[in-house]
């Protein structure tokens, strides 16, 4: 029996069970291009399904990649009926939270009401470390709740264009961290529930009930994130020492979280030995270095899908260019037969 792992993402792209796909790695290795490519190929392969691509990176690039503006509300990609994009904006989300708090306390008086009216809540929460990851996590919870209750837009799969590795690991730790915190909170509320509810204010907010509901939602997410049929992580790297080192750290962390990870996209490969005519010495030298680390990647991750993507002559921006580039996620790039594609990318204004 042939146990060779295919050097493509066909099994993921045609998957009928995955609900959450995370795409991440070191900064500057092509995470956004890779996440856009995966989302496009999934949408093309299964036109009857709806897909949502979310950027959780504070330095949003989805709008730049597609050449059209996306915001905090999901919007269809022009030219694709089953792919939507959104960029989670922490500052806008915090403003919404502050406005909601002001509205709920509009009849209140005193220092707390004045604090809210002054926007101090958003200023305070905006400075909390990890707030970007927490807001992204809230977005995940919102989608799970909407799908269970049949509210809002329904998406079969959500693809995350994540922040660089450190932010992403904090995001993925949130289910376990929140679960532990809420367990402790549960112990406290068992004794002090009525008192806590009375402290929630005159608006009759059932604080204990809200926390209990939050705990239930967090447990559902934790369960789904550790189910390999529902969630997977695609690592993105380039063939250099620092990127390889960070990829290995990321893989080990994901394994410790019981998350499925079995795919690596290696971007910006030169394939210089296949260049027509005399290739420049710098390209040949760099390709020699890339091959050295490619060999290490193949050896380290022999049971992974290793997808080797070429360095293109132009920018991979706009839907048409992304479609051309993303085809190599399904059909491995052939440096001889496919070399002209990397020179055919359309110029974007």
UniProtKB/Swiss-Prot annotation:
Its EC number is 3.6.-.-. It is an enzyme of class 3 (hydrolase). Pfam families: ArsA_ATPase (PF02374). It is found in: Cytoplasm; Endoplasmic reticulum; Golgi apparatus. Keywords: ATP-binding, Cytoplasm, Endoplasmic reticulum, Golgi apparatus, Hydrolase, Metal-binding, Nucleotide-binding, Transport, Zinc. Its main location: cytoplasm. Gene3D superfamilies: P-loop containing nucleotide triphosphate hydrolases. One of its GO terms (biological process) is tail-anchored membrane protein insertion into ER membrane. ATP binds at residues 26-33, 240, 267. ATPase required for the post-translational delivery of tail-anchored (TA) proteins to the endoplasmic reticulum. Recognizes and selectively binds the transmembrane domain of TA proteins in the cytosol. This complex then targets to the endoplasmic reticulum by membrane-bound receptors GET1 and GET2, where the tail-anchored protein is released for insertion. This process is regulated by ATP binding and hydrolysis. ATP binding drives the homodimer towards the closed dimer state, facilitating recognition of newly synthesized TA membrane proteins. ATP hydrolysis is required for insertion. Homodimer. Component of the Golgi to ER traffic (GET) complex, which is composed of GET1, GET2 and GET3. Within the complex, GET1 and GET2 form a heterotetramer which is stabilized by phosphatidylinositol binding and which binds to the GET3 homodimer. Interacts with the chloride channel protein GEF1. Belongs to the arsA ATPase family. This is ATPase GET3. The lineage of its organism: Eukaryota, Fungi, Dikarya, Ascomycota, Saccharomycotina.
